[in-house]
From Swiss-Prot:
List of residues binding Mg(2+): 245, 288, 315
GO process terms (BP): glycolytic process
Function: Catalyzes the reversible conversion of 2-phosphoglycerate (2-PG) into phosphoenolpyruvate (PEP). It is essential for the degradation of carbohydrates via glycolysis.
Organism lineage: Bacteria, Bacillati, Bacillota, Clostridia, Eubacteriales
Family: Belongs to the enolase family.
CDD domains referenced in this protein's UniProt entry, alphabetically: enolase
Gene name for this UniProt entry: eno
Organism field: Clostridium botulinum (strain 657 / Type Ba4)
Official protein name in the record: Enolase
Keyword line: Cytoplasm, Glycolysis, Lyase, Magnesium, Metal-binding, Secreted
Length: 431
């Protein structure tokens, strides 16, 4: 088998994501005609320390959100350097782009430009070798199907309602397989829709396919989800668990947390106690961004209070960045990292963050963004690294369902070799 195959063309274009905003798509062609294509996602609530998503800023086109500058960077600066390189050397490709950019946060070329190229190269390499992407990235031991962390009620920046916390999710950790987990979530989703309708609530959906009703409180969202779980014939806390993403950086003002929908302003200590109360009342298995990205003291309080029994995921806190993750590990805050490819900008750096987390006993949850495309890379990535958990929205809206359908295909391909770990995926807590 050849271990060297040249890149002969790198080409980017502007396409639309699921939120009707432009994003970058990249094609990489090899000397034998093999092609790899990747599209880049985009977030609505973004961490302050994420790599830069390069936008044009021309208000007369796409309200300033065009990505033609990033596209041009791919078609000129990046292409000029990568053409002739070996597509099978992912580390060298990503290192070359990082050096070309020369900034700490990808501000020159744009993380959206670099990620599109990085992923398209990996896909082209996998296609050339005749391998599935998860096998190419993960090797012979890539086999773990993830527990879905499925967003079924949206609030915060993902919806136009009065719910402060951004995401209320279900996790079918009691399922025997991924396909059964997906079925369970689908049935709960339908049960939730009928439950909301019966209580007079709107069943319009948010960016990620979850319902976005004007509930009376954040706690009511949990209560109505538990009703739906039971209505679908499952047991909360045994078959299906609750996960939250408050996106607390979005409600952090002057050192306190503003739950405007409930008319409450809480100190970090009070916010931690708020989560403690919720975790004692309901089967909550995971809380993402429970504290703001720079509230390290609040994170420490929260971790000390419930970090042994609830997965505490750092998203804005860590932004898939090994430097921030290393700080968190040293301080003993959180016990899990959310992995978003476009927060850091290359596949290599993403894999480094996952490896660092797992070595420290932290779990890694591979995630979509609110602005998605039909690209299914994260489905392959989560299996490649045996992460065991994926967050990619409700079982509705085709850009979300595309990832779940790809996981069904992977499960089928792995057959008896595939493994669904369920509760064992939460090795960072006592469950």
């Amino acid at each position: 088998m050849k271990n060297y195959i040249e890149i002969v063309d790198v080409y980017a274009r502007q396409i639309l994501d699921s939120r009707c905003n432009p994003t970058v798509e990249v094609e990489v062609e090899l000397e034998d005609g093999t092609v790899g294509v990747a599209a880049v996602p985009s977030g609505a609530s973004t961490g302050a320390f994420e790599a830069v998503e390069l936008r044009d800023g021309d208000k007369s086109k796409y309200l300033g959100k065009g990505v033609l500058k990033a596209v041009d960077n791919v078609n000129t600066i990046i292409a000029d350097e990568l053409v002739g390189m070996n597509v099978l050397d992912q580390v060298a490709i990503d290192k070359t782009m990082i050096e070309l950019d020369g900034t700490d946060n990808k501000a020159k070329l744009g993380a959206n430009a670099m990620l599109g190229v990085s992923l398209a190269c990996a896909k082209a390499a996998a296609n050339f070798l005749g391998m599935s992407l998860y096998q190419y990235i993960g090797g012979v031991n890539a086999k773990v199907l993830p527990v879905p962390m499925m967003n079924i009620i949206n609030g915060g920046k993902h919806a136009d309602n009065n719910v402060d916390l951004q995401e209320f999710m279900i996790m079918p950790a009691g399922a025997p397989s991924f396909s059964e987990a997906l079925r369970m979530c689908s049935e709960v989703y339908h049960a939730l829709k009928s439950t909301l309708k019966s209580q007079g609530y709107d069943t319009g959906v948010g960016d990620e396919g979850g319902f976005a009703p004007n509930l009376k409180s954040n706690e009511e969202a949990i209560i109505v989800i538990i009703e739906a779980i039971k209505k679908a014939g499952y047991t909360p806390g045994k078959d299906i668990f609750i996960a939250l993403d408050p996106a607390s950086s979005e409600i952090f003002e002057d050192g306190k947390y503003n739950l405007a929908g409930e008319g409450r302003v809480l100190t970090p200590e009070e916010m931690a106690n708020y989560y403690v109360e919720l975790a004692e009342k309901y089967p909550i298995i995971s809380i993402e961004d429970g504290m703001a990205e720079e509230d390290w003291d609040g994170w420490k309080i929260l971790t000390e209070k419930i970090g042994k029994k609830v997965q505490l995921v750092g998203d804005d806190l860590f932004v898939t960045n090994t430097e921030r993750l290393a700080k968190g590990i040293k301080l003993g805050v959180a016990n899990s990292i959310l992995i978003k490819l476009n927060q850091i900008g290359t596949l290599t750096e993403t894999l480094n963050a996952i490896e660092m987390a797992e070595r420290a006993g932290y779990t890694a949850v591979v995630s979509h963004r609110s602005g998605e495309t039909e690209d299914t890379t994260i489905a392959d990535l989560v299996v490649a690294v045996n992460a065991g958990q994926i967050k990619t929205g409700a079982p509705a809206r085709s850009e979300r369902v595309a990832k779940y359908n790809q996981l069904l295909r992977i499960e089928e391909e792995l057959n008896d070799m595939g493994e669904y770990r369920g509760l064992k995926a939460f090795y960072n807590i006592n469950k």
